[in-house]
Amino acid sequence: MSKKKTIAFLAGGTARAAGITAHVLRKKAEKTTYKAELIEPVQPRKMGFYEKYVKRGLDVACASAAIICFSPLYIGVALLVKFKLGSPVIFTQDRPGLVDKDGRETVFKMYKFRTMTDERDENGELLPDDVRLTKFGAWLRKTSLDELAETFNILNGTMSVIGPRPQLVRDMTFMTKEQRMRHTAKPGLSGLAQVNGRNAITWDQKYIKKVGFKEDVRIILETVKKAFIKQEGISQDDMATAEDFGDYLLRTGKISQEEYQDKQRIAKQILTESGK
């Protein structure tokens, strides 16, 4: 067999293996994905050709290539987390994903490498995030290495390489319908907001109006430049644990204490009814 044929054979085999793996992971993810039924629906956005037919294939290709090429890095981070923080190595959390046909967000399990301890108070309640976040965990977040595990979310179809960053379920309940339009695009590992230096919803609203191949490539290149060349993270600057959207609205006087408590109650109910 010639060298060219060997390369073509290996490339074809790798592509088939990636496709099968993505299919299996997607079926598994469907069993843990549920819908946020307690919030009002938004109007689903019409997707273009690229977003509807091309983007998913590129996501699988990019995620598979990243896992294969950077497998030593994945293993190294996993071993460090195991040594520094113990088990589990992977942290999962429910996050709002793509809006379904009925206008309500699906909620999926997002994967991250663990950055915090499980320290609890005398009542068995977890201590605040800023207390449980270790120096090692803060470094993982600063370098965005904790985000590497999200490539498996990309493979299972709950996330994309590029798209609005997935917020917390409780953040979603505080958003207006216009702000929730960000969820009409699949959540991403990086997005327009991150390469512009801040996690602002307005950037996500701009992104959904111009989803396209050229824009995604530009954001990927900007992300590589920011995360690897400039060695900056893709999270909000100077915030190891970002402020919840509801806390921000309450702090700035944009909502009342009563509204705040009501939205928090809805968020807890969404998570509780999921069987969590």
Name these PLM-found stretches.
Residues 12, 17-32, 42-118, 213, ...:
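A hydrophobic, helix-centered structural microdomain
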Residues 127-187, 220-223:
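A short, structured surface patch at a secondary-structure boundary
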Residues 63, 91, 134-138, 170, ...:
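Positions in alpha-helical segments
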Residues 117-120, 158:
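Feature marks short, surface-exposed loop/turn motifs that line or immediately flank catalytic pockets
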Residues 119-127:
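A short, polar/charged loop-to-alpha-helix boundary motif
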Residues 1-11:
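Membrane-penetrating hydrophobic segments
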Residues 187, 191-199:
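Short, intrinsically disordered, charge-balanced linker/junction segments flanking boundaries
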Residues 204-209:
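Acyl-group handling in specialized metabolite and lipid biosynthesis
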